[in-house]
Amino acid sequence: MNSISPSQSYVHMQELILPNDSNILGNVLGGKVMHLMDLCAAMSALKHCRNQVVTASVDNLDFLAPSKIGDFLILKSSVNFCGNTSMEVGVRIDTEDRKTGILKHTASAYLTFVAIDENGKT
């Protein structure tokens, strides 16, 4: 893989929390957050190696605070480390309160990706 700076793998995504994405308490579903984290991190990994990647593992996924219907999830990711066969991507999620504009850190995770060729091999 070519050596590039973490800033070149940076991805910023935003998602509006809708009722279909929430539980009975009006909080976003953890599975929805995990899905968005995986997408955001995968884009960083793709930008880094310019090749197909697969998620190998998710480490240290921490849900720090709930996010509510109508709030904005703000996801940021970049490659933290790249080895010979895999790379670690860090993802941070902040939630912007739709009424006040106040941001709070709501989740973080580290994901490991592996680059694969057109035959699905590493």
Q: What residue ranges belong to the model's regions?
A:
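HotDog/MaoC-like acyl-thioester-processing domains
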Residues: 2-13, 68-69, 80-122
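A broad, structure-centric signal for solvent-exposed, well-ordered loop/edge residues
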Residues: 20, 24-25, 35-36, 65-70, ...
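Hot-dog-fold acyl-thioester-processing enzymes
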Residues: 2-54, 114-122
